Amino acid sequence: MSKQEQSNQIHIVLGLGCSGISAAKLLKTEGKNVLVLENNSNKNLLNISNKLKSEGINVILLDEALHINNFTPWIESVCSITVSPGIDWEHIALKELRGKNINVQGEVALAWERLTHIPSVGITGTNGKTTVTNMLNHILKLNNLNTDMGGNVGKALSKIALENMKNNDQELDWLVLELSSFQIEGSPKVAPTIGIWTTFTPDHLERHNDMESYFKIKRSLLEKSSIRIYNSDDQYLSSKRKELPKGIWVGTNQQSLYSQYQKFWIDQKGYIFEDKKQLFHSSILNIPGKHNLQNLLLAIAAAREIGLDDSSIAKSIKSFKSIPHRLEYLGNVNNLSFYNDSKATNFDSSITALKSVPHPIILLAGGIQKKGDFMPWVKQIKQSTNGIVLFGLSANNLKEELLISSYIGEIIVKKNLEEATIASINIARETNSRSILLSPACASFDQYKNYEERGDHFKNLVKKYKLIK
């Protein structure tokens, strides 16, 4: 292809979020002709658009639903289309583009091509993946390994690729990547050195349609990983053990003691073992919840495969703190503790939180309800709470389902999180509850940009009402 032909080739990026912006900048730095298409339009996007244009990146704010006709002006000259993870991989427009043999790829796939020479850990799962990603990155950094963390948490992978390109004199030792199902399905060539599967429960079924499709996407990452690590405490993963590619299994359940396939496990006294070798006591981890012991074992298994000794791992774990919005302890006033678990965007994640903080609890929940089995959540609410305050789009629907299930605690519906927080404080004091827990079990997009914004709002509300000194 001549230089003139190359200059006429257009690389289209879909989406003006963090992933899309990073992908566009990466392509532009490589000298590509870049066009970003965004199907929304507001003041913030306009500001971002103007900034990118000043850097020589073309941006069009469509302000309409994505359609194949949006690509008509460039259909003969498009070289690649890079898709942000928020856009459904099975969108009809993307299917039609693939049908025209156009290179349609996820943002992670674009970045991965520039990073394949760096050893990597790819962490996926319905819940737990963010904690494992942060914990493992913390362990590696404290042991003087040059790492970067990104994907679905931290930096967009394209940003890491761009930084690595500019700082090629400081080669990374390891990439620690959290990879969502959305990112995996658009990046079929991503093949980590180590793959970790934390948990598997219903989530994102409004996009993946059914559990089997969701499972296949997650499994594909492990199939392409050189070393595989699984959580045997997860019932679904354990039930599929014989179908999954061979790997390392970890578990906290007592039956792990007698299982032949556990490599990392915890005994009745809380000591962590690697096969028959005692490593150290699990109490060195200073964050609550049995699920975090599962996360700990997964991180330890990966660190051992990378080559760290057990004493170095233990020393690093002692300084690991809870991650914002994931069972984040905010403090205690008059024997009432406050927890921010805004990351709980599905029922299973909220169940884990309800099991992990002091009972009885006043629960704050609501937002956009996802598909999934409601009843296990209700069962745990009955066991753990004195009352529940609901807010957001699905509040009334959740209330109806709770009433049908014969929940006897107090149920209050409020318009927003601020009103809900005030109500929760009053109920907690009236019922001598020990904890107020924000664990919404729903997506945040009805009232917030993301779960982080929702969690930050809750933390500010706690400060506003002078609950935490």
From Swiss-Prot:
Q: Where in the cell is it found?
A: Cytoplasm
Q: What is its main location?
A: cytoplasm
Q: Does the keyword Phosphoprotein apply?
A: no
User: What Pfam families does the database record attribute to this sequence?
Assistant: Mur_ligase_M, MurD-like_N
- Keyword terms: ATP-binding, Cell cycle, Cell division, Cell shape, Cell wall biogenesis/degradation, Cytoplasm, Ligase, Nucleotide-binding, Peptidoglycan synthesis
Q: Which residues bind ATP?
A: 125-131
GO cellular component, alphabetical, reads: cytoplasm
Under which pathway is this protein filed? Cell wall biogenesis; peptidoglycan biosynthesis
GO BP annotations of the record are:
cell division; cell wall organization; peptidoglycan biosynthetic process; regulation of cell shape
Q: Which GO terms describe its molecular function?
A: ATP binding; UDP-N-acetylmuramoylalanine-D-glutamate ligase activity
EC number(s) reported in the record: 6.3.2.9
The protein's annotated catalytic reaction(s) are: UDP-N-acetyl-alpha-D-muramoyl-L-alanine + D-glutamate + ATP = UDP-N-acetyl-alpha-D-muramoyl-L-alanyl-D-glutamate + ADP + phosphate + H(+)
Which family does the similarity line name? Answer: Belongs to the MurCDEF family.
Q: Which PANTHER family match?
A: UDP-N-ACETYLMURAMOYLALANINE--D-GLUTAMATE LIGASE
Q: What does this protein do?
A: Cell wall formation. Catalyzes the addition of glutamate to the nucleotide precursor UDP-N-acetylmuramoyl-L-alanine (UMA).
Q: State the name under which the record lists this protein.
A: UDP-N-acetylmuramoylalanine--D-glutamate ligase
Which organism was this protein described from?
Answer: Prochlorococcus marinus (strain NATL2A)
Record gene name: murD
